[in-house]
Structures are given as C-alpha cells and as structure tokens.
Amino acid sequence: EEVVVAYTALTEGIGVYAFPYDVLTSKHKADGASGLADDAANFLVVLRNIGTSLQDMATRKGIAAALRSINPTIASVELDSIQNPQRAYVGHRLGDKTLPLELHQESDGFRRFYAHLLALYQTPPKQTLVFEEPENGIYPGALSLLADEFKATPEAGRGQVILTTHSPALLDHFSADHIRVVELDEALETRIGPLAEEQKEALKEELLHAGELLTVDPARRQDE
C-alpha cells in the first residue's frame, strides 16, 4: 500500500510545466492524463472539469478575476460543448456587445498566462507544481499578477510551487526566505540551498533587491 501511495504521488501528484509559445492551441484532449498535462494538451478537459464542478465556483471566480486584471474586456472563457469540447472561446465585452474569439487567436502571452492559471487552479490540485522560466512571453504587468498567484497557491492548500527563473523582474516579487540557490560544485554535483546569510540580510534591510541577485550581486548558497 505504501508503494502504491508513493507511486501515485510521484506520477500524479507532481506537475512539471514549461509552456511553449503555442500552448493552448492544440486540440488533443489527452484524456489519460491526471490533471493538466505537462504540455497542457488536455486543457479542454481541465476547463470542462473546472466549469462543471459545483464546488469550484471560487476557482472560476479567481481565474476570471485574474484574467480581467490583465485585460478588463474579458467577460468569460467558455467551451463549445460540455460533453465533447473541441474549442474554447474568450468573450470580450465591447460596450453592450460580447465578441467571442477562439482561444488560439489570443496572444502568446495571454495563453501562457492562462495556462499557468489552469495549472495552479486544476482540480484535484497537484501536491507539487514546478514551473520552468514562467516569465517567458509574459509582459511585466501580468508577471506581477502571476507572482501573486504563485504565492497564493500554497496558502490556499493547492500544492507547493517551485519556480526556476532568470528574470530579475520575477525574482523581485519574492522574499529572501523564498529563494533557493542552485550551484554546481567542484565535484560536478548539484547543490541546492538557502541564500547566503549576508545576502539575506541585505535584502531584509533593503540594501539589495531580489532581482539584483541575478545582475549586481550573483546569488550565493549558504555554506553548510
């Protein structure tokens, strides 16, 4: 039984995401995946599950609010069919009219942002969510909102979030206690650990911004 639990946690409880520029354009449903597939190819199924769950009203409201924060004209995201979805439409409110656009017609940045939201809000939630360079293709205003969503996810009990980034703008949204440094030591072994104590203090005293750990004063790992 313990082996089964461990296997399930490793295979279904972890999501690893590095969304490509054409994310959310594929119509492959990938029904065998548990939760959002790593390439988000089954996004139609995930959208359907969120949309049909009576318990997910707060989830739908959270996603809608985040989308409206980056584009106030967005009224909704709807599927063409609940039973057998083939397309998703983004409704844009223009005056007293709503203009529906297919999801694949939206910008790369919008689709990437939305894909991250689907990963963060999927049901059931993953135990661990890993995102590789989530800043790619996201404009600065949306990046701030995405950072807020990353931080809110574990607080809401929707899983641990691990990010890898080379973006000073994204790193600026996280405190010293959130940051881990990855280094390759002299034995060519990967070491991961908290930020060096002197750099932590510099951040807390606002002598250094977190983003400057990638530019001005490269991040160092605390000695063991």
Describe each model-derived feature in a short phrase:
Residues 132-133:
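Walker B catalytic acidic pair
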Residues 1-124, 213, 219-220:
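Phosphate-coordinating catalytic segments in nucleotide- and nucleic-acid-processing enzymes
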Residues 144-224:
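C-terminal lobe/lid and adjacent interdomain/linker elements of RecA-like ASCE P-loop ATPase modules
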